[in-house]
Amino acid sequence: HGRTLTACNDINLNVYKGKTLGIVGESGCGKSTFVRMVISLDKPTSGEILYHGKNLANLSKKETWLNRQNMQMVFQDPLASFDPKMKIVDILTEPLINFGKLRRSEKEAKARELLEMVELPGDFVDRYPHNMSGGQRQRISIARALSLEPEILVCDEATSALDVSVQESVIELLVRLQKEKNISMLFICHDLALIRSFAHQIAVMYLGNIVEVIPGEDVTEHAV
């Protein structure tokens, strides 16, 4: 029999409405496994992940799919998650069409609105991902993730592949959108200095455990 590898153990965290919880730790500490469980890609072998009081591990396939609207993800490498043959107009509106929230005739207008939200020109609708810079692609990722108006945005090393100046502008954008839309953010990162600059609370992970929770601003709201 193979031994069970415990990637995450004894983790007890709350994500608060409109606030950012940072998860920081070195590679291999369990951050990615934790994220996969939060967004229901993996199920925990024990314990619960509660969202509005419901245990996500107990949801049916259909309920899990519907719940994806409430939790959206921004990855480190947008190119890996985009279809290179799709224009930006289709990349941005695909989630809305999949969930039956947009007519095809409304695609371009909605895509332009989403581009404006992330401070990109409207004529980007006709571009392809490879015709854009890394920072621009990450803005497209953010716009796509927020198109469904989720309650929680999960950013997995979302700025680590970007230059420092671009990193700062993307974080400024996320902070602005969080305030405007009152979104909760779970921001996974290996750079403590970066995450301290904007997170309200930071959990430090080491070998699958939360070893320290560093408070940011006072967090008094109720957990979602």
Q: Residue spans of the language-model regions?
A:
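ABC transporter nucleotide-binding domains
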Residues: 1-223
